Amino acid sequence: MKIKVKLFEGGKMPQINEKGDLFDVFARTKVILNAPQAGVQHQVNLEKVRDVVFSNKLIPIGFAMEIPAGFKANLLPRSSTYKKWGIIFGNHVGQIDSSYCGDNDEWMVNAIALR
């Protein structure tokens, strides 16, 4: 099966890790995410509790791919993603189907910083 891949400026081709069967993808640009502040006090009377606001950003991963009809791709974090980068995926699993295949349909990761 052949799959068309379009690289965007600064993007890298998905790479198969020599120890596994999955593709690794890489951020195309530097993205700064602000993590919520630690030290929120929780008391029974709730007077000193404040909301913790999490921000998310879409991180471009540098390519578009033409998925064949009837197939889909899943973007999943590696088990080391949080340890290395302090982020989680906002939607936990990014699912991309064959309809997302236009020239400007760059794949992105919805990321939330926790630290």
Predicted regions and their residues:
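DUTPase catalytic domain/fold
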Residues: 1-115
